[in-house]
Amino acid sequence: MVILKARQWGGSTVVEMYMAWIQAVLATGCHAIVCGAEKTGTQVVLNLYSDMLTHYPEELWEGETMPRLRTSRGIMQLDGRDNRVYLAASTNPNAVRGVDASLVHLTEAAYWKATKGKDPWDTVRAIYCSVAMA
């Protein structure tokens, strides 16, 4: 699914919550990549996932315990679900090369800057090579 959107209407939040719900409730072994102009900009995603887990009704969890969110070196892990979210920056397309991802969110892509020897499209190609075609 591709969503082209205007800024500040909530589309990114909807995408992130949908991805978080899939990972927290529906699927195991379902990894995601979130890439922004800067890696620090993807901190918003971490906050959204944390908020979703904090406020998700406990009685709706099918497992014995609600999954916890652990973070380490740009990777968020949902304990008990075998799902990860890889946070990446558009300036480093090789950072997620080889990741087995099912979900991708390219955020603020219009603001991705070209750097010496790297074009934003290099990042898009690197990320989409990580998505298995079913």
PLM ranges: what are they?
Residues M1-A134:
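Phosphate/NTP-binding elements of NTP-utilizing enzymes
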